[in-house]
Amino acid sequence: MRCPYCQNADTRVVDSRLIGEGEQVRRRRQCPSCGERFTTHEAPELVYPRVVKSDGRREAFDEDKLRLGFRRALEKRPVATEAVEAAVRRVCKRVSGAGEREVAANVIGEYVMEELRELDVVAYVRFASVYRRFEDVGAFREVIEGLEQHRRDDD
């Protein structure tokens, strides 16, 4: 890797560590020419399928949009940022790992709901109310009853 300070074409790795859930590598490098040290991060470049919206439009998968959806649902909830990032990574991995050229937006929505159900039930209900376009209290009741059943099944 080229040194960002002196542009020397050769640098050496001083230290390597896995970060996150082992999906990124942090490397400390040193330039033998100028002696400067710098940090690099390596992560796999995932190829995501196109997202097919409910009206038939197709758009590129957007990890930032996914992250924003999680953050909106989890706003003012006691969930660690690391837990949210891990959930985002799991959804991204499922989307890219399917090996499909296209994925329906509702499939991604279901992945998000599965993650939110485990992270925070209030956020799950918030997300479900928007995602499934609740129009009455009965829809909320059905989701809450489903949550209670899921909890009983886990016990």
Swiss-Prot record:
<keyword id="KW-0678">Repressor</keyword>
<dbReference type="GO" id="GO:0045892">
    <property type="term" value="P:negative regulation of DNA-templated transcription"/>
</dbReference>
<dbReference type="Pfam" id="PF22811">
    <property type="entry name" value="Zn_ribbon_NrdR"/>
</dbReference>
<feature type="zinc finger region">
    <location>
        <begin position="3"/>
        <end position="34"/>
    </location>
</feature>
<dbReference type="InterPro" id="IPR005144">
    <property type="entry name" value="ATP-cone_dom"/>
</dbReference>
<keyword id="KW-0547">Nucleotide-binding</keyword>
<dbReference type="GO" id="GO:0003677">
    <property type="term" value="F:DNA binding"/>
</dbReference>
<protein>
    <recommendedName>
        <fullName>Transcriptional repressor NrdR</fullName>
    </recommendedName>
</protein>
<dbReference type="InterPro" id="IPR055173">
    <property type="entry name" value="NrdR-like_N"/>
</dbReference>
<feature type="domain" description="ATP-cone">
    <location>
        <begin position="49"/>
        <end position="139"/>
    </location>
</feature>
<comment type="function">
    <text>Negatively regulates transcription of bacterial ribonucleotide reductase nrd genes and operons by binding to NrdR-boxes.</text>
</comment>
<dbReference type="Pfam" id="PF03477">
    <property type="entry name" value="ATP-cone"/>
</dbReference>
<keyword id="KW-0067">ATP-binding</keyword>
<keyword id="KW-0805">Transcription regulation</keyword>
<keyword id="KW-0479">Metal-binding</keyword>
<keyword id="KW-0862">Zinc</keyword>
<dbReference type="GO" id="GO:0005524">
    <property type="term" value="F:ATP binding"/>
</dbReference>
<keyword id="KW-0804">Transcription</keyword>
<keyword id="KW-0863">Zinc-finger</keyword>
<comment type="similarity">
    <text>Belongs to the NrdR family.</text>
</comment>
<keyword id="KW-0238">DNA-binding</keyword>
<dbReference type="InterPro" id="IPR003796">
    <property type="entry name" value="RNR_NrdR-like"/>
</dbReference>
<dbReference type="GO" id="GO:0008270">
    <property type="term" value="F:zinc ion binding"/>
</dbReference>
